[in-house]
């Protein structure tokens, strides 16, 4: 049986979403010190092994913009791209992706920006281990 370990899903999503949408900057934690409108923060918040070869990853996605309308627009684009990842040719093989509806979520770390947040779950193969 081939053993696998989880991948760095924050980096995988950051890389793949940035390749699909160049109008935003995508980050994994920590929050960048120069956070600005158009930034998207992707943070793993949980997950589980779903088979001998695949893992499920729960992530939180924060979309920052200058105002509420722009934050909604940005989160709609990122949400749509994320759930479409299994249908796209990306650096990571996603077998499933779903997400809940984005919601307004004030961030005290960035009071000058509006933020929309959504949770998502993606499933993809792990990294093969050689033992």
What are these regions (language model features)?
Residues 1-51, 85-93, 130:
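Small/polar-rich, solvent-exposed N-terminal microdomains that initiate assembly or binding
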Residues 82-131:
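Acidic-leaning, charged glycine-interspersed low-complexity segments
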Residues 45-48, 59-63, 80-83:
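Short, low-complexity, polar/charged sequence segments that are solvent-exposed and flexible
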Residues 40-42, 54-57, 74-76, 111-112, ...:
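Surface-exposed beta-strand edges and their flanking turn/coil or helix-capping segments
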Residues 67-88:
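Mid-chain, well-packed structural core segment of small domains
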Residues 53-71, 112-125:
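Oligomerization/assembly interface segments of phage tail-like spikes and tubes
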Residues 3-7, 65, 110:
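Charge-dense, low-complexity intrinsically disordered segments
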